[in-house]
UniProtKB/Swiss-Prot annotation:
GO biological process, one term: glycine decarboxylation via glycine cleavage system
Name the UniProt record assigns to this protein: Probable glycine dehydrogenase (decarboxylating) subunit 1
CDD domains named among the record's database cross-references: GDC-P
Family: Belongs to the GcvP family. N-terminal subunit subfamily.
Protein's organism: Halalkalibacterium halodurans (strain ATCC BAA-125 / DSM 18197 / FERM 7344 / JCM 9153 / C-125) (Bacillus halodurans)
Molecular function GO terms recorded: glycine dehydrogenase (decarboxylating) activity
EC code(s) of this entry: 1.4.4.2
Gene: gcvPA
Length: 447
């Protein structure tokens, strides 16, 4: 009899041993020297009955802090946003419930159309001409943009702003190390990229210039100035953007960006230990054949009816492994679907209104924090995040706020030693006036 949870019974094991011509597990592993073989029993507890198992995991889950119970002012790349209820309903349908693009695309027209709509909406937001079907997350997309730029320009120097998310820079450096590429960081000045330092670093060996807009500190970057420096030579201009912010801001494509990447988490993807997310990657037609990942295109069949296909597949590793544009094979199709459903449900006007509320509520939070004696650092145009400076140790502030029902902002001292005692505060459209007022009052006690 097969067990509900165990993949292999005693009879199954014996059948497999007979099939390969050995009598026992001991005989199967006989070539492994006795002195390096594990002896004894594994330290694994006895099996639990289903009600006991559910109770055990429920107890573990109860130790987590849930956003339904706390008001979150934590962002730094993962944000608490409104998710339309229809999103979970659609992505739970069996036809869609996979992280992969279909291997027989001609019989998966619904899934391909959903991905095509995702690509189309990303192009609209970014002001670009081509977008792929998604990537693992924003940092992966950023690293792939840098790799593509180096391949396109035949250069090996990558200039990246220190105002780009630290974890995205870590992923970039990991990718660059294996390919012997040079990553040079551009300093910041008052919370934005230092254009003068960029000018000093830029030379004929530069493959790309990478900035984030809005950047990690929440500030809006001077994209026009950075673009003019980036395109002095053959380098590409790469912009990492929060797609929700692009519902309100002038798109990077309008500033001459060659590649726009980011994380679609603000659209329909919940906060969950930092993932899974959904990276997006958009670029120009000129660079279309160098784009990593899958591309869904629209065409017509032999009867003149509209259809969708995976196109330009000669770029991919299953066609030409040695000359592939990247080693990205799977993607985040399910989360891309969630993002597409969220964007379509909220609509153009809704996305703009949602972005506007982020700006307005962040501005209101700033004013309330100031009124409670809190110092705002690196002030200037921002989207939904800003920096505050506190006199008390931030771990004490975080614990005190949690006890009052708030999840504090991000401790910048963890990744920027010079910003010890500085907190990155995020305010999204789901925060209420009452929550912001009370948060400002509680934080003011540590000013």
């Amino acid at each position: 009899m097969n067990h509900r949870y165990l993949p292999m019974t005693t009879d199954d094991r014996q059948e497999m041993l007979q099939a390969i011509g050995v009598d026992s597990i001991e005989e199967l592993f006989s070539d492994i020297p006795q002195d390096i073989r594990f002896k004894g029993k594994l330290n694994i507890p006895n099996a639990l009955k289903e009600p006991e198992l559910i109770r055990y995991f429920q107890q573990l889950a109860n130790e987590n802090v849930h956003l339904k119970d706390k008001a979150s002012f934590l962002g730094a790349g993962v944000y608490d946003h409104y998710i339309p209820s229809i999103v979970d309903h659609v992505i739970s349908r069996s036809e869609f419930y996979t992280a992969y693009t279909p291997y027989q695309p001609e019989i998966s027209q619904g899934e391909l159309q959903a991905i095509f709509e995702f690509q189309t909406m990303i192009c609209e937001l970014t002001g670009m001409e081509v977008a792929n079907s998604s990537m693992y997350d924003g940092p992966t997309a950023l690293a792939e943009a840098a790799m593509m730029s180096c391949g396109h320009t035949k250069k090996k120097k990558i200039l990246v702003s220190k105002a780009v998310h630290p974890e995205a820079r870590d992923v970039l450096m990991t990718n660059a190390y294996g390919q012997r590429l040079e990553v040079v960081e551009i300093d910041t000045n008052n919370g934005v990229t230092d254009v003068e330092h960029l000018k000093a670093l830029y030379d004929e060996e530069t493959a790309c210039v990478i900035v984030q807009h809005p950047n990690f500190f929440g500030r809006l970057e001077p994209l026009a100035e950075i673009e003019s420096v980036s395109h002095q030579g053959k380098a590409t201009f790469v912009v990492s953007s929060n797609p929700l912010a692009l519902g309100l801001l002038k798109p990077p494509g309008a500033f001459g960006a060659d590649v726009v990447v980011g994380d679609a988490q603000p659209f329909g993807i919940p906060t969950q230990y930092g993932g899974p997310h959904c990276g997006y990657f958009a670029t120009t037609k000129k660079l279309m054949r160098k784009v990593p990942g899958r591309l869904v295109g629209q065409t017509t069949d032999d009867q003149g009816q509209r259809g969708f296909v995976l196109t330009l597949q000669a770029r991919e590793q299953h066609i030409r492994r040695e000359k592939a544009t990247s080693n990205i094979c799977s993607n985040q199709a399910l989360n891309a679907l969630a993002a597409a459903v969220a964007m379509a449900t909220i609509g153009k006007r809704g996305v703009k209104e949602m972005a506007l509320q982020n700006v307005q509520k962040a501005a209101y939070a700033k004013s309330q924090l100031k009124a409670n004696g809190v110092e705002i650092v690196a002030e200037g145009p921002c989207f939904n995040e800003f920096i505050i400076k506190l006199s008390s140790p931030l771990h004490e502030v975080e614990e005190a706020l949690l006890a009052k029902g708030f999840i504090a902002g991000y401790d910048l001292g963890k990744v920027y030693p010079e910003l010890e005692g500085h907190m990155l505060v995020a305010v999204t459209e789901v925060r209420t006036k009452e929550e912001i007022d009370q948060f400002a009052k509680e934080v003011g006690m540590f000013a």
